[in-house]
Amino acid sequence: MQIYQFGKIVSKNKNYLILENHGSGYLIYVPRIDRFSRDENRKIYIYEHENDYTKITYGFASFRERILFEDLISIQGVGPKTAISALNSGMQNLINLIAANDWKTLAKIPYLSEKNAKQIVFEFQKKYERFNENHKNQTEETNQDSQEKELEKNDDLADITIQKSNLEDKTAANLEDTLKMLGFKPRQIDYALTKVEPNENFENLIENAIKIISNAREFRN
């Protein structure tokens, strides 16, 4: 599974951009294209959608945005164009609407019917409630870690031992929970948790864990 492309944005239009990588150009449709700049070197998370007639690559600014896109298109009647339209309203805004069971506001998004909005909330409300809770916990832990590092730098407190094991345990628990929500099996998750290196950026931690699972021979079909 290819997770992202890294390259230079050589052109952008209203709905898509062209990313150059090792002499090849990739046409990628993205939501909220204003976030991407021409001549910028950028990592873009990708999803390749293929049917009997076409193969289109969609790109995202973050891995979490890619996950949300996949969830949206898993709903019958919601295609990639509708999912991109929904993401144009903002990823976090969309997550908050789903988590809050606000299908009425969701249904106001262009191309998204009331029926589909209700189904999205029905399928994913609990998941995105947990996503928000995990994000909140991770932010609090990151702030706590920063404060602890400041104490280590600025204060001569040799007699104080700052406990980091709880932070590590919570991060591992959040990672495990996220991988479960993404559909990975317990054996795959356990393997990733034993191999992944610590990373202060939780999204990078998820990405690295998925790479480990994808590259493991025992989990290949």
Swiss-Prot record:
Q: Which domain of life is it from?
A: Bacteria
The segment annotated Domain II runs over 62-139
Keyword set includes DNA repair: yes
Keywords associated with the record: Cytoplasm, DNA damage, DNA recombination, DNA repair, DNA-binding
Region Domain I, annotated ranges: 1-61
Q: Where in the cell is it found?
A: Cytoplasm
Q: For this protein, what is any one GO molecular function term? A: four-way junction helicase activity
**Residues annotated as region Flexible linker?**
140-166
Under InterPro entries, the record lists: DNA_helicase_Holl-junc_RuvA_I (IPR013849), NA-bd_OB-fold (IPR012340), RuvA (IPR000085), RuvA_2-like (IPR010994), RuvA_C (IPR011114)
Q: Which GO terms describe its cellular component?
A: cytoplasm; Holliday junction helicase complex; Holliday junction resolvase complex
Task: Please give one Pfam family short name.
Answer: RuvA_C
A Gene Ontology biological process annotation? DNA recombination
List, as start-end ranges, the regions of compositional bias called Basic and acidic residues. Answer: 146-155
Q: Does the keyword Acyltransferase apply?
A: no
Which parts of the sequence are annotated with region: Disordered? 133-155
Instruction: Cite the residue spans of the region called Domain III.
Output: 167-221
Q: Which NCBIfam families match?
A: ruvA
What's the stated role of this polypeptide? The RuvA-RuvB-RuvC complex processes Holliday junction (HJ) DNA during genetic recombination and DNA repair, while the RuvA-RuvB complex plays an important role in the rescue of blocked DNA replication forks via replication fork reversal (RFR). RuvA specifically binds to HJ cruciform DNA, conferring on it an open structure. The RuvB hexamer acts as an ATP-dependent pump, pulling dsDNA into and through the RuvAB complex. HJ branch migration allows RuvC to scan DNA until it finds its consensus sequence, where it cleaves and resolves the cruciform DNA.
User: Oligomeric state and partners?
Assistant: Homotetramer. Forms an RuvA(8)-RuvB(12)-Holliday junction (HJ) complex. HJ DNA is sandwiched between 2 RuvA tetramers; dsDNA enters through RuvA and exits via RuvB. An RuvB hexamer assembles on each DNA strand where it exits the tetramer. Each RuvB hexamer is contacted by two RuvA subunits (via domain III) on 2 adjacent RuvB subunits; this complex drives branch migration. In the full resolvosome a probable DNA-RuvA(4)-RuvB(12)-RuvC(2) complex forms which resolves the HJ.
Domains: entry comment: Has three domains with a flexible linker between the domains II and III and assumes an 'L' shape. Domain III is highly mobile and contacts RuvB.
> To which protein family does this belong?
Belongs to the RuvA family.
- Please report the name of this protein according to its UniProt entry: Holliday junction branch migration complex subunit RuvA
The species this protein was found in:
Mesomycoplasma hyopneumoniae (strain 7448) (Mycoplasma hyopneumoniae)
